[in-house]
Swiss-Prot record:
S-adenosyl-L-methionine binds at Q290, Y319, D340, D388. GO terms for molecular function: 4 iron, 4 sulfur cluster binding; metal ion binding; rRNA (uridine-C5-)-methyltransferase activity. CDD domains: AdoMet_MTases. GO terms for biological process: rRNA base methylation. [4Fe-4S] cluster binds at C76, C82, C85, C166. Its EC number is 2.1.1.-. Signal peptide: none annotated. It is an enzyme of class 2 (transferase). Keywords: 4Fe-4S, Iron, Iron-sulfur, Metal-binding, Methyltransferase, S-adenosyl-L-methionine, Transferase. This is Uncharacterized RNA methyltransferase LMOf2365_1727.
Length: 459
């Protein structure tokens, strides 16, 4: 039986009490919770119910009766349609406060830990919270008689929103994407049709090294074929000298994953170079690298502040990617070991260590939850562990391994407060949360990165 007093299509007044973990406003109508994208804490609004469930209602904003002083005009022309950003309508100082609150909400919802007893610091923001993303992944679509569009899927949909410019992207990523889009149209290259499963070019991926100026272009295709390849490569080489690597990745799966397993070189180098904290890193097409290079140094500085190192410690860099975090600490410890499931990332990590003259690192391909226990069985016990997992959080097998290994210091770098809270509840059996430091890696969005220092409890 539906206990919700709201009916679909119903319009009603609402006061927004707080904002949720996805950046939406939250209010209560006859004690039933209502989620309203685009509404801000303190606003009095009129909304229309669009989706009614037993325990909650999703509504759209119809009218603002009392506006928040933190409301600003979103500068992006496709902000409401695109779904890539959730907070452009919120003043930046208020975005930073919200992100700290999102961490608190996650602790409240997913653990029995009292967040008022935790030291949750104010969010570290950016001086200029625009044009920060070093990588774009724009889908392609054919419209009308041969016109090619590139853009992002709208929020919770597979409707492509055409994007001519994106104000959170590094300008070169947009410049290259638009140039390639026009080439695809000019040469009539077949564009992937999701419903029919036909066509060739699915996605245009561009990543740039902000410190080096090197840029990589990846054609994500539905087959190994790429018609008019020679002509397009010649035009790209002539017009875009900043593009130093052109790759093709084949993804034939009917899924939302961008990359497939097969990647090969079309022109230039296999990877691009980026610099971070006085180190140099090679980035291959599928390798993970932080999307906001400006804030990455701030993030790693917070990790550095969290760890107390004398130089005699052994350190594990779990989910190591191309080795950035571990190599930043290699000069401060006796040995660093890292693991990652993507073979290309481990190849990059090894090459990066060699390039940076770092000899006290060891890397292995594999899942963290498999590799760490293996190392322990071989007699290696880390004094400190850094985990920087994907949005899904730490695998439960890794949590068990961490609890078994009992490293004195554990730093958790999270990109998802919900899975962070879930993992902290499990780690709390043996670890004490010293503090949590939110870092804004993705201004204008509801995403928040958090550095958490955990210390082994005294027995």
């Amino acid at each position: 039986m539906n206990q919700n007093p709201v009916e679909e299509g119903q319009k009603f007044p609402l006061t927004i009490r707080r904002m949720g973990i996805n950046g939406e406003g939250i209010g209560y109508f006859k004690k039933a919770v209502v989620f309203v994208p685009g509404a801000i804490t303190g606003e009095e609004v009129v909304v229309e119910a669009v989706k009614v469930r037993d325990r909650f209602t999703e509504a759209k904003l119809n009218k603002i009766r009392k506006k928040s002083p933190n409301r600003v005009t979103a500068p992006c022309p496709v902000y409401e349609a695109c779904g890539g950003c959730q907070l452009q309508h919120v003043a930046y100082s208020a975005q930073l406060e919200l992100k700290r609150d999102i961490v608190i909400q996650s602790i409240e919802k997913h653990t029995k830990i009292d967040p008022t007893k935790l030291k949750i610091r104010p969010t570290i923001g950016m001086e200029d919270p625009w044009r920060y993303r070093n990588k774009s992944q724009f889908q392609t679509r054919m419209v009308g008689s041969g016109q090619v569009e590139t853009g992002l899927f709208g929020a919770n949909s597979h409707q492509l929103v055409p994007i001519e410019d994106c104000i959170v992207q590094q300008p070169v990523t947009i410049k290259v994407t638009n140039f390639v889009r026009d080439l695809l149209e000019k040469y009539g290259v077949p564009i992937y049709d999701e419903k029919a499963g036909s066509g060739i070019v699915r996605t245009i991926v561009v990543r740039t090294g902000v410190k080096t100026g090197e840029t990589q272009l990846v054609f994500i295709t539905n087959s190994k074929k790429l018609p008019k390849k020679r002509e397009m490569l010649a035009e790209i080489e002539a017009a875009l000298p900043e593009v130093t690597s052109i790759m093709q990745n084949v993804n034939q799966a009917k899924s939302s994953l961008i990359f497939g397993d097969e990647t090969f070189l079309l022109a230039g180098k296999e990877s691009i170079e980026e610099k971070l904290m006085e180190l140099e890193f090679d980035l291959s097409a599928r390798a993970f690298f932080q999307l906001n290079p400006f804030q990455t140094e701030r993030l790693y500085q917070e990790v550095e502040k969290a760890l107390v190192l004398t130089g005699s410690e052994t350190l594990v860099d779990a989910y190591c990617g191309v080795g950035t975090i571990g190599q930043a600490f290699a000069g401060k410890v006796k040995e660093v070991r890292g693991m990652d499931i993507i073979p290309e990332s481990i190849e990059d990590a090894k090459r990066n260590a060699e390039k940076n003259g770092i000899e006290n690192v060891y890397y292995e391909v594999g899942k963290a939850e498999d590799v760490l226990p293996k190392w322990v069985n071989e007699g290696f016990r880390p004094d400190a562990v850094i985990v920087d997992p994907p949005r899904s959080g730490c695998d439960q097998g890794l949590i068990k391994s961490l609890l078994d290994v009992e490293a004195k210091q554990l730093v958790y770098v999270s990109c998802n407060p919900s899975t962070l809270a879930r993992d902290l509840a499990l780690l709390a059996k043996k670890y004490r949360i010293r503090y949590m430091q939110p870092v804004d890696m993705f201004p204008q969005t509801a995403h928040v990165e958090t550095v958490v220092l955990l210390q082994l409890k005294d027995k």
